[in-house]
C-alpha cells in the first residue's frame, strides 16, 4: 500500500512529491529520518516495522524515484511501479528523456497521472494510452511550431484548429470506437506516421589470445521502440529478417499477436504514441560457430597487442572498423585503457596515434583514447604507447594494459544483422498516405577486451 | 526556432498593459516554461480571486498553482486556508479541474471534515453523469474523503453502481470497496461479499483485474469463491492487467495447494509406484521421472506459458514462483521460464534495482536445484556496469553453480575480477566464492591457495577487510590438509609481524597456529614470544587467541615431556610464557578474556593435564565453506536476501486431503449489451477464436470443455440481471436511457460488420477483408 511517491535529483533535491494521505510525511520530513543512515544508498530502506522506502535511479540524468509503502506480498511490486511510472511519463510526454525542468513545469500533470494510477493505495491503471485519455495532454504552441517546418503547407490547408494541433482529439465518450483496451479511441492525425526504432546494445567480454580474440561471455540486448501516430484503429504487420537468431525469449508488448513465424512476424493494433514493442536478448556464447560469434559483435572490434618494439615494452591498440554502406560514421568512439597498479613515478607515454587524442586520468590506473565526434567507417585507427619506468628502476618488468573498455554508437545497422523487412498497415482511413520510418541504432554497453 | 520563440515570449512578457487574463492566455499558449513563470507569480492574495472566477481558464490556472504547490513541498502559501475556495470547484464543468480538486481532497479532506462534507452533494450528482469516466471519478473522490460518517452513503452508491454498464465504473467499484474495507475491516464483510461475487463473475478482464486485487487484499482466505471462475480465469490470464496477472498467480498458487490434488511423480526407470510430489522443490528421489498433474492444475500451468513473453519483470518472477511452488524441476526447465529470467538479467534497459531482485529469485532457485541454471553460468559473470549488490548476488549464484566442468572458467573470471575490482564488499564475496571453487578438487585447492598467498603478500594497497577475508579463506583451506601446507603456515605466521592486519585476520592466524602445535611445534614458541609484548595493544579477539595459543603450547609441551621429574611450569620457557600471558589476561578489560584466563589458570595450577589435552588439543572438524548453503535443509536466511523476498518464497504446504470441489464454470455477468458501443467485441471476438483454437493444440487441455467458459455470445441474452437492470434504470432516470437507445441503434450497423469480421478473421486474408468492410462503413455513413 503506497503512502507517498517522490521524485528527486541525485542530490536528493525534491522535484515532485505526491502524498496519498494527510498523515504521509513530506520528503523533507523523510529525509531527516533517513539522514543518519548509510543505508540510504540502498534500493530499499526500512523506515518502520512495516514501512519501507524504495528507491530507483533512472536514466542518464539520474532522476531518483522514491516510493514509501507498506510491505506487500510481492517484493518486486514497488520497484516495478516506479519503473512503470517513469515509463508512463516518458510515453505521456513523448520524450526520449525527462528533465527536471519538464517535471517541475508539469507538476499538475504528474499529480493527476498518479491520482489515476494509484487508488486505495494500490496500483490501478498503468496503461499510458488510458492515462492520456484520463489526463488529456494539451499540445501547446511550441509543438506546432516544431512540426511547422515539415508540415507548414498542410497545416495551413486545414483551418480546423483540432486538425491544426495534429493531436488526437479526446471525445467525451470513452468507449466509442475503442477496439482494444490499450489504444486511445478516435485518434486523428493529419499525417499518418509510424516510426520503428531498433536499438541494440553490445555487452561482451573478449580476451586477446595471441593475434585472435576469443569471446568469454557476451550478449546483445535489443529493443524495438515504436512511435505511432496513425488515425483510426489500424493493424500493423511488422516482418523482421532475423538473420538466424531465434528470438524465442523476447518480451513482447501485450498488443502483439504472434504469427506462425514467431517473433519474425508480428501483427498488432498499436497503442497511440510511443511504446516499446519488443525486447530481446541474444546470447552470443550460445552461437556454435566461433566465427559467427565475432561477426555478431558489430562493426567495431578492438585488439590489444603488447610486448612490441625494441625494448619489448610497448603496447598497441588497434581498432578495426568494418566497412558498411549503411553506416556513415561511428560516433563518440572512446576506448578506456586500464592498467594494473603502476608505481607513482612511472609514466604512461603515448608514442603514436593515428586518430583522436589521449586523455590521462588522475587515478593512474586508466587513460582514455578519445576520438572525434565521428570516425569514418573502414578506417583502422592505431595507438601505440608504453609505460615508462622511472629512472630509479629502469629494469623493472614492463607494464601493459590489463583491459580495455570500448564505447561507441552508430546508426544504420545492428550488430546482430536483424533488419525490418516490411511494415504493412491495414485498416487505415481511405486516402491517407502513411509515412513509415525505420531507424537502427547500435551502442556498446559493457564491451571489454582483456589482455 | 527556439530563439524566435523566446523573442515572442519576451515580447508578450513586456506587454505590461495587457490585462491579466490576456497575458495568461498568451504566455500559457507559448510554452510550459513561460506558463510556469506566470503561475509562480500567483500568490496567496490573487489565488482566491482565480479560484472563485467565473472563467474556467482562471479557475484552472488557480488549481494548477495549487497542484504545483502541493507537488513542490513549498509551504509559502498555506493551502488549508483556501480549503473552501478550492473545494467549491468540485462542481466545475471542466473535468480536469474536478480531478485536481479530487487530488487536493485526497490529501486535505481529513484536516477539514466539515467543509469537505459540503462537497458531497455535487459529487453525488455527478455519479449519474453520462460520461463513465466522470462517474468513476465521482466514486473515487467520494471514497477518498476519509470521513467515517460517509461510509453508509458510499456503500449505498456502490450497490447502485456495481451493475453500471461501463467497465470503468465497475473497476472503480472494486477499488472503492477495497478502500472501505481498509477503513472498516471485517465488519462490512456481509455488504462487500455479494458485490465481490458479482465483480468476480464479470466478463470484462479489466473488472476481473480490479476484483482480484480486492480479493487478495481483503479476502485472500476465501478461496472457495473462485471455484466457478478457475477455468475461465486461466483462459483470460493474459488479458488481465500486468499487476493483476501477478496477483492472480499468487492467489492460484494458494488455491491449487488447497483444493487441487497433489501431482504424482513416477520413476520412468523402474515400474515403482508413483509418489506424491515432495514438499520441497529439490527432493525428488528419482534421476529420471515424469510428473502427472491434475488437469485443472495443468490448465493453470499451461496458461502461464502465455505470459513468458511478458515485458513485466514482476509477472515473469511470479510465473517462475508458480512453477517453483507447484511443479518439479523438470517442468520448471521445460517451461522456458529459465530463458525469460535470464533475459531480464542481461537486458540493458531494465533498471538495476529490478535486476537485483530477479537475481535474488534466481539465487533461490539455484539453491534448490543448481542444474536449472548451470549451463548458463556465464550469464552471471560480472559486468562493469553492474552495481555492487548485483555483483554480490551474481557471485553467490556462481558459487552455487560451480562444478568440475566449469570451475576453470569461473576461477579465471574471479581472478580477473579480484585484480581489477575496487569495491571491498565485492572482493570479499570473490574470496568466498573462490573458497567454494577450492572445494571442488585438491588440484583447485592448491592452486587457489598459492594464488591467495600471492595476492596477500604482494604489497598491493588493497583493503584490509579484503585481506582479512582472503586469510580466512586460506585458513579454512589449510585446515583441510595441515601437513601438506606447513610452508603456507610459516608464511602466514610471518605476516603477523610484517603486515598491518585487521583483528579479524590476525585472530584466525593465531588460532590456526595453535592448531598446528601438534603438527609442527617448532614454529609456535617464537610467534608467541613476539606476540606477548604487543598483548595490551591488540584487539580483544586477538588477545583471547594469544592466551589460547599459550595454553595449547603448554599443554602440548607437557604431553611431550619425557623427563623423570614432574613437569615444572615455573622453569620451562613455554611455561613462563604462559604465565606471562596469564598475568596480562587477568587484568584485561574484557570479561571473556579474564574468564578464560581464570579457567586455564585453575586447570594448569591443579595439574589436570589430561583435561587440558582434551580441551585444547581435540581435533576440530573441517569447516564447510560458508557459501555451500543448504544442500539438505533448505534455509533461505543464509542467502542474505531482502526480508520481503524471503517471505515471498516461503513454501506453502500442500493440503493433504483436498476437499472435493466443483470447478464447472459458473455464469458470467456480461454487461456489454448495455453499452453504448459494441465495437470492442471485434477485439474480443478475435481473441475468442484464438482461445477455442488454442486448447486443441495441447492434448492435456483439450479434455476441458472449453467453449462453456470462453464463448459467452449465446448466453448474453439469457441473463436475468439484464431485465432487472433495465427496469432499475428506467425507474431511476429516464433521460439517459433515451439517449442510450438512440446511440445503440446508430451503432448497430457497425456491430454487424465487426461480427462478420471476427467470423472471417481466421485465415490470412483477414486484414484484407476487414479493410474492405471498413471502407464500406465509410460509404454507408
UniProtKB/Swiss-Prot annotation, chain A:
Its main location: Golgi. Residues 191-450 form the MHD domain. GO terms for cellular component: AP-3 adaptor complex; clathrin adaptor complex; cytoplasmic vesicle; cytoplasmic vesicle membrane; Golgi apparatus. It is found in: Golgi apparatus; Cytoplasmic vesicle membrane. It comes from the Eukaryota. Gene3D superfamilies: 3.30.450.60, Mu homology domain, subdomain B. InterPro entries: Adaptor_comp_med_subunit (IPR050431), AP2_Mu_C_sf (IPR036168), Clathrin_mu (IPR001392), Clathrin_mu_CS (IPR018240), Longin-like_dom_sf (IPR011012), MHD (IPR028565). Pfam families: Adap_comp_sub. The keyword Transmembrane helix does not apply. Keywords: Cytoplasmic vesicle, Golgi apparatus, Membrane, Protein transport, Transport. GO terms for biological process: endocytosis; Golgi to vacuole transport; protein targeting to vacuole. It is a peripheral membrane protein. Adaptor protein complex 3 (AP-3) is a heterotetramer composed of 2 large adaptins (APL5 and APL6), a medium adaptin (APM3) and a small adaptin (APS3). Belongs to the adaptor complexes medium subunit family. Part of the AP-3 complex, an adaptor-related complex which is not clathrin-associated. The complex is associated with the Golgi region as well as more peripheral structures. It facilitates the budding of vesicles from the Golgi membrane and may be directly involved in trafficking to the vacuole. This is AP-3 complex subunit mu. The gene is APM3.
UniProtKB/Swiss-Prot annotation, chain B:
Pfam families: Adaptin_N. One of its GO terms (biological process) is Golgi to vacuole transport. Keywords: Cytoplasmic vesicle, Golgi apparatus, Membrane, Protein transport, Repeat, Transport. It is found in: Golgi apparatus; Cytoplasmic vesicle, Clathrin-coated vesicle membrane. Residues 746-758 have a biased composition (Acidic residues). Residues 694-713, 731-781 are annotated as: Disordered. GO terms for cellular component: AP-3 adaptor complex; clathrin-coated vesicle membrane; Golgi apparatus. Residues 699-712 have a biased composition (Polar residues). It is a peripheral membrane protein. The keyword Lipid biosynthesis does not apply. Coiled coil: none annotated. Residues 759-774 have a biased composition (Low complexity). HEAT repeats lie at residues 113-151, 153-186, 187-224, 294-332, 521-559. It comes from the Eukaryota. Adaptor protein complex 3 (AP-3) is a heterotetramer composed of 2 large adaptins (APL5 and APL6), a medium adaptin (APM3) and a small adaptin (APS3). PANTHER family: ADAPTOR COMPLEX SUBUNIT BETA FAMILY MEMBER. Part of the AP-3 complex, an adaptor-related complex which is not clathrin-associated. The complex is associated with the Golgi region as well as more peripheral structures. It facilitates the budding of vesicles from the Golgi membrane and may be directly involved in trafficking to the vacuole. Belongs to the adaptor complexes large subunit family. This is AP-3 complex subunit beta. The gene is APL6.
Amino acid at each position: 500500500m503506497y503512502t507517498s511517491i517522490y521524485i528527486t535529483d541525485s542530490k536528493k533535491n525534491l522535484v515532485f512529491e505526491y502524498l496519498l494521505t494527510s498523515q504521509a510525511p513530506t520528503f523533507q520530513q523523510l529525509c531527516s529520518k533517513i539522514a543518519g543512515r548509510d543505508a540510504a544508498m540502498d534500493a530499499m530502506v526500512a523506515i518502520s516495522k512495516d514501512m519501507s522506502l524504495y528507491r530507483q535511479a533512472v536514466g542518464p540524468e539520474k532522476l531518483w524515484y522514491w516510493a514509501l509503502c507498506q510491505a506487500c506480498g510481492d517484493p518486486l511490486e514497488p520497484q516495478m511501479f516506479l519503473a512503470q511510472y517513469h515509463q508512463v511519463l516518458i510515453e505521456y510526454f513523448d520524450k526520449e528523456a525527462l528533465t527536471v525542468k519538464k517535471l517541475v513545469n508539469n507538476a499538475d500533470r504528474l499529480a493527476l497521472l498518479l491520482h489515476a494510477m494509484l487508488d486505495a493505495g494500490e496500483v490501478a491503471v498503468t496503461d499510458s494510452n488510458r492515462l492520456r485519455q484520463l489526463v488529456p495532454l494539451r499540445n501547446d504552441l511550441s509543438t506546432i511550431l516544431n512540426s511547422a517546418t515539415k508540415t507548414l503547407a498542410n497545416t495551413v490547408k486545414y483551418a480546423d484548429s483540432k486538425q491544426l494541433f495534429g493531436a488526437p482529439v479526446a471525445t467525451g465518450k470513452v468507449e466509442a470506437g475503442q477496439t482494444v483496451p490499450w489504444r486511445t479511441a478516435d485518434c486523428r492525425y493529419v499525417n499518418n506516421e509510424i516510426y520503428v526504432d531498433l536499438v541494440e546494445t553490445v555487452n561482451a567480454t573478449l580476451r586477446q589470445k595471441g593475434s585472435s580474440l576469443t569471446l568469454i561471455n557476451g550478449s546483445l540486448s535489443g529493443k524495438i521502440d515504436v512511435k505511432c501516430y496513425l488515425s483510426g484503429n489500424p493493424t500493423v504487420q511488422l516482418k523482421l529478417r532475423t538473420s538466424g537468431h531465434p528470438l524465442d525469449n523476447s518480451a513482447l508488448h501485450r498488443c502483439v499477436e504472434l504469427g506462425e513465424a514467431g517473433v519474425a512476424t508480428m501483427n498488432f493494433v498499436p497503442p497511440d504514441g510511443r511504446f516499446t514493442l519488443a525486447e530481446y536478448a541474444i546470447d552470443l556464447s550460445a552461437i556454435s560457430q566461433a566465427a559467427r560469434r565475432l561477426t555478431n559483435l558489430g562493426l567495431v572490434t578492438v585488439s590489444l597487442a603488447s610486448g612490441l618494439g625494441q625494448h619489448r615494452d610497448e603496447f598497441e591498440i588497434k581498432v578495426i572498423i568494418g566497412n558498411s554502406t549503411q553506416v556513415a560514421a561511428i560516433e563518440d568512439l572512446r576506448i578506456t585503457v586500464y592498467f594494473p597498479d603502476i608505481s607513482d613515478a612511472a609514466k604512461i607515454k603515448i608514442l603514436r596515434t593515428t586518430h583522436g587524442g589521449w586523455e590521462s586520468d588522475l587515478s593512474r590506473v586508466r587513460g582514455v583514447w578519445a576520438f572525434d565526434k565521428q570516425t569514418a567507417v573502414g578506417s583502422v585507427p592505431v595507438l601505440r604507447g608504453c609505460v615508462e619506468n622511472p629512472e630509479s628502476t629502469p629494469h623493472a618488468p614492463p607494464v601493459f594494459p590489463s583491459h580495455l573498455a570500448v564505447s561507441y554508437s552508430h546508426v544504420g545497422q545492428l550488430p546482430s544483422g536483424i533488419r525490418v523487412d516490411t511494415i504493412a498497415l491495414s485498416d487505415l482511413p481511405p486516402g491517407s498516405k502513411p509515412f513509415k520510418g525505420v531507424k537502427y541504432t547500435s551502442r556498446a554497453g559493457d564491451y571489454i577486451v582483456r589482455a | 526556432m527556439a530563439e524566435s520563440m523566446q523573442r515572442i515570449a519576451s515580447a508578450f512578457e513586456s506587454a505590461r498593459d495587457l490585462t491579466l487574463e490576456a497575458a495568461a492566455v498568451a504566455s500559457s499558449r507559448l510554452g510550459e516554461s513561460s506558463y510556469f513563470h506566470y503561475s509562480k507569480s500567483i500568490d496567496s492574495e490573487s489565488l482566491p480571486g482565480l479560484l472563485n472566477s467565473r472563467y474556467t481558464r482562471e479557475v484552472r490556472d488557480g488549481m494548477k498553482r495549487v497542484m504545483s504547490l502541493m507537488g513542490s513541498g513549498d509551504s509559502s502559501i498555506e493551502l488549508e486556508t483556501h480549503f473552501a475556495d478550492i473545494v467549491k470547484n468540485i462542481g466545475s464543468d471542466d473535468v480536469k479541474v474536478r480531478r485536481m480538486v479530487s487530488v487536493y481532497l485526497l490529501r486535505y479532506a481529513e484536516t477539514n471534515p466539515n467543509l469537505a462534507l459540503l462537497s458531497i452533494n455535487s459529487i453525488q450528482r455527478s455519479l449519474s453523469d453520462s460520461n463513465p469516466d466522470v462517474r468513476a471519478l465521482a466514486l473515487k473522490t467520494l471514497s477518498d474523503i476519509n470521513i467515517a460518517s460517509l461510509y453508509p452513503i458510499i456503500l449505498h452508491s456502490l450497490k447502485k453502481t456495481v451493475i453500471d454498464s461501463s467497465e470503468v465504473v465497475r473497476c472503480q467499484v472494486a477499488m472503492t470497496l477495497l478502500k472501505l474495507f481498509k477503513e472498516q475491516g471485517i465488519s462490512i464483510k456481509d455488504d462487500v461479499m455479494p458485490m465481490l461475487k458479482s465483480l468476480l463473475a464479470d466478463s470484462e478482464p479489466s473488472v476481473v483485474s480490479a476484483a482480484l486485487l480486492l480479493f487478495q487484499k481483503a479476502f485472500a482466505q476465501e478461496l472457495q469463491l473462485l471455484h466457478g471462475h478457475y477455468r475461465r480465469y486461466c483462459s483470460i490470464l493474459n488479458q488481465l492487467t500486468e499487476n493483476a496477472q501477478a496477483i492472480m498467480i499468487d492467489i492460484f498458487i494458494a488455491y491449487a495447494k488447497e483444493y487441487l490434488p497433489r501431482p504424482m511423480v513416477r520413476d520412468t526407470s523402474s515400474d515403482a509406484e508413483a509418489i506424491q510430489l515432495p514438499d520441497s522443490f529439490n527432493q525428488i528421489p528419482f534421476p529420471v521421472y515424469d510428473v502427472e498433474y491434475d488437469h485443472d492444475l495443468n490448465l493453470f500451468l499451461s496458461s502461464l506459458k502465455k505470459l513468458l513473453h511478458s515485458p513485466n519483470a514482476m509477472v515473469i518472477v511470479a510465473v517462475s514462483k508458480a512453477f517453483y511452488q507447484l511443479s518439479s524441476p523438470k517442468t520448471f526447465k521445460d517451461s522456458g521460464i529459465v530463458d525469460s529470467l535470464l533475459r531480464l538479467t542481461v537486458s540493458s534497459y531494465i533498471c538495476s534495482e529490478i535486476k537485483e531482485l530477479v537475481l535474488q529469485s534466481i539465487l533461490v532457485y539455484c539453491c534448490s536445484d543448481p542444474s536449472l541454471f548451470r549451463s548458463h553460468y556465464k550469464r552471471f559473470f560480472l559486468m562493469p556496469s553492474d552495481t555492487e549488490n548485483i555483483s554480490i548476488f551474481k557471485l553467490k549464484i556462481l558459487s552455487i553453480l560451480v562444478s568440475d566442468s566449469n570451475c576453470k572458467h569461473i576461477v579465471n573470471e574471479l581472478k580477473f575480477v579480484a585484480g581489477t575490482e575496487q569495491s571491498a564488499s565485492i572482493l570479499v564475496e570473490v574470496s568466498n566464492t573462490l573458497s567454494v571453487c577450492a572445494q571442488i578438487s585438491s588440484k583447485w585447492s592448491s592452486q587457489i591457495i598459492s594464488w591467495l598467498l600471492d595476492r596477500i603478500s604482494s604489497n598491493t594497497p588493497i583493503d584490509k577487510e579484503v585481506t582479512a577475508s582472503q586469510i580466512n579463506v586460506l585458513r579454512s583451506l589449510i585446515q583441510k590438509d595441515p601437513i601438506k601446507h606447513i610452508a603456507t603456515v610459516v608464511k602466514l605466521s610471518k605476516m603477523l609481524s610484517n603486515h598491518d592486519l585487521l583483528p579479524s585476520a590476525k585472530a584466525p592466524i593465531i588460532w590456526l597456529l595453535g592448531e598446528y602445535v601438534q603438527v609442527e611445534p617448532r614454529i609456535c614458541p617464537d610467534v608467541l614470544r613476539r606476540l606477548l609484548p604487543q598483548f595490551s595493544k591488540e584487539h580483544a579477539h586477538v588477545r583471547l587467541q594469544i592466551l589460547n595459543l599459550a595454553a595449547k603450547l603448554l599443554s602440548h609441551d607437557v604431553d611431550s615431556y619425557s623427563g623423570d621429574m614432574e613437569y615444572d611450569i615455573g622453569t620451562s620457557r613455554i611455561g613462563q610464557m604462559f604465565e606471562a600471558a596469564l598475568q596480562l589476561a587477568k587484568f584485561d578489560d574484557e570479561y571473556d578474556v579474564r574468564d578464560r584466563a581464570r579457567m586455564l589458570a585453575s586447570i594448569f595450577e591443579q595439574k589436570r593435564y589430561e583435561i587440558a589435552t582434551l580441551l585444547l588439543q581435540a581435533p576440530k572438524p573441517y569447516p564447510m565453506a560458508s557459501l555451500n548453503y543448504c544442500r539438505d535443509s533448505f534455509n533461505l536466511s543464509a542467502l542474505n536476501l531482502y526480508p520481503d523476498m524471503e517471505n515471498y518464497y516461503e513454501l506453502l504446504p500442500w493440503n493433504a486431503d483436498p476437499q472435493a470441489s466443483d470447478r464447472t464454470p459458473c455464469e458470467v455477468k456480461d454487461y456489454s449489451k448495455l453499452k453504448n458501443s459494441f465495437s470492442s467485441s471485434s477485439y474480443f471476438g478475435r481473441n475468442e477464436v484464438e482461445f477455442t483454437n488454442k486448447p486443441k493444440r495441447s492434448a492435456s487441455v483439450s479434455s476441458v470443455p472449453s467453449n462453456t467458459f470462453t464463448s459467452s455470445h449465446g448466453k448474453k441474452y439469457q441473463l436475468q440481471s439484464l431485465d432487472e437492470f433495465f427496469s432499475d434504470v428506467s425507474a431511476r432516470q429516464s433521460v439517459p436511457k433515451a439517449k442510450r437507445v438512440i446511440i445503440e441503434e446508430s451503432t448497430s450497423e457497425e456491430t454487424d460488420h465487426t461480427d462478420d469480421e471476427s467470423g472471417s478473421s481466421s485465415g490470412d486474408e483477414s486484414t484484407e477483408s476487414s479493410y474492405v468492410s471498413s471502407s464500406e462503413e465509410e460509404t454507408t455513413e
